[in-house]
């Protein structure tokens, strides 16, 4: 029996994994095994939030070497990460400085100037991408204005997954799904938009033509001397997660739940109407020419920060405590831009409740309950915005990613949205990464074919809405909470 062994490098903003997939084509069985896990976190360098890119590369190589040490012949490798951040290279291909995190404050005020100078409708008409203050469009302008002495030495800019592929193969690539997150790709041409790039103040020569998922970038030479193909997968982690979302029909929506929550639906055409602009809907690139019509929600970033600040290590116990608390005593707008990177998340949440004359959550369970209720209510609002945009309601919501393990949040989401929620798979980004590799190896025909493999190998859990739940009755009041300055508005 012939087996295919593919390795997925899946990097998130808080952790990274090297995962080994084993696929049996005849039985269509697909298994995953974690080979190596490591921490990823922001580090301050000269007062700037940066990524320790060299440490991450070392961890990736450690994971790949571990697979080889087991005597496994790897058929291919794929890398997916978060979007918008980039690495600068000189003409010799050497790294210049450390990549700055999208959570750094250097872009403060830049988006507002772009809108004033270029026009919001023009930017959106060109890119189809939502307005987020950390988009690469604004990061590059901040770079050009704040570090002009640096850019004269730059020859190339690679997005994070493309940089790691370059380090493994020596070949540069600009993968399309991740490139679209920059707000610099023209939605009609699938190439870099000349006007938007000109506004950044950096050279268009830094960027090569974007390539769609499924091409071989080059080869990594393993310690045994074998040349292993490195595939350009859908390198934006959400794009990979959507590929692995077992969407039952065209009327199914998805929610990729992790540090960020990305809620949306698939479409063969983009949505760039005035209504889409008003709702700040994004049209990010997907596999096979599909668009990921979605909206960013701050997600479990709030919980991750609270857990760290409150020294909570047992999440299951915390959720059990949280479940005993009354719903909607404390409600915030998770997308308020005050929560993007506060000095202390717990204190910021408490301040937001205090300022709106609510009870103040003090215990870890109360803070978690505030986050879960608030996210569920925001999910319901965004799902309604998306349904209005497409002109018809959704039949199901598929929650994938690490956040889908939170049964309480899944049920609250079903109750608030009034829709059936199907949770799983957990390892959606990794699976979507593997799916593109298997298509590149000619083991699968397309995304829909791969989704049948996912449903045949991974258990899904269904959550039915309870229409009488208090959270469903609170939605009208929540609308008032959203009258704040939203990050993603």
Curated annotation (Swiss-Prot):
Gene Ontology CC terms: cytosol
Cofactor(s) required, per the database record: Mg(2+)
SUPFAM superfamilies per record: Actin-like ATPase domain
Reactions the enzyme catalyzes: L-rhamnulose + ATP = L-rhamnulose 1-phosphate + ADP + H(+)
Enzyme class: transferase
Residue numbers binding substrate: 83, 236-238, 296
Pfam families: FGGY_C, FGGY_N
Binding site residues for ATP: 13-17, 259, 304, 402
Keyword Protein transport: no
Keywords recorded for this protein, A-Z: ATP-binding, Disulfide bond, Kinase, Magnesium, Nucleotide-binding, Rhamnose metabolism, Transferase
EC number of the protein: 2.7.1.5
Pathways involved: Carbohydrate degradation; L-rhamnose degradation; glycerone phosphate from L-rhamnose: step 2/3
Active site per database record: 237
GO biological process: glycerol metabolic process; rhamnose catabolic process
UniProt entry tagged with the keyword Nucleotide-binding: yes
Family named by the database record: Belongs to the rhamnulokinase family.
NCBIfam families in UniProt: PRK10640.1, rhamnulo_kin
Protein name: Rhamnulokinase
Organism of provenance: Enterobacter sp. (strain 638)
